[in-house]
Amino acid sequence: MMNTPTSKSLFKNGISLYIHIPFCQTKCTYCDFNTYQGLEHLISPFLDALVTELHLWGHSLNHPTINTIFFGGGTPTYLPQGALERILKEISQVFEIKDEAEITAEANPDDLDEQKCASMLAQGINRLSIGVQSLNNAALQLLGRRHNSEKAIQAYLTAQKSGVNNINLDLMYGLPNQSISHWHDTTQVISQLQPSHISMYCLTLEQGTPLFTWVEPNKLSPPDSDLAADMYHYAAELLEEPGSVHYELCNWSYPG
């Protein structure tokens, strides 16, 4: 670990902090990330261990300034009330969080209500990344998502109403049985919602996931790569608006 006089100068422009929350209420059929369901009894010891590690790194790196914090997962919004607030409080004790730091939490649509959104905003979380994935209910069911299209839209509007002005919406394309018309419907509605950020990712079938096992024995048609390319190009043209920034292959940001 690095606790030297030069460590402060090494990070003079600040750092970004990613915190992985590995707990989910249910695991999606495509997910190959380090996530778990049914281990709620480990949340409390996990948080204790996380706090210990945060202090260890904060002291070792000589308390650098933090520009951005990202709570990923897993499902950060699945943590019990006050958990994210506790983590942020501990971070502030050993790191210097910039006043204008962007603090993001990934969220499932069915976890978000006005009370939860307002609570996270009060705790310092000023950006949400909502896992919409699709507005086609059959696709959502195939992916093992708990929400439906109506809930996805409602979650976004609820977050906005609660005062969260910086919201990313995640989408997925290149899914088994996904038609171009379904993709058109999803992207058009998402575009009309005018979030501040949109991410869209092509499905990768990961060995060991339920979705992979369904496709391999031909229980399910595999994704069509040519169709997926058409989906990407359609969405890329749709999302190009005055002021938009297509800063990375899968990401668009918008002014405001």
Spans of model-derived segments:
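C-terminal scaffold of the Radical SAM
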Residues: 2-14, 35-59, 64-256
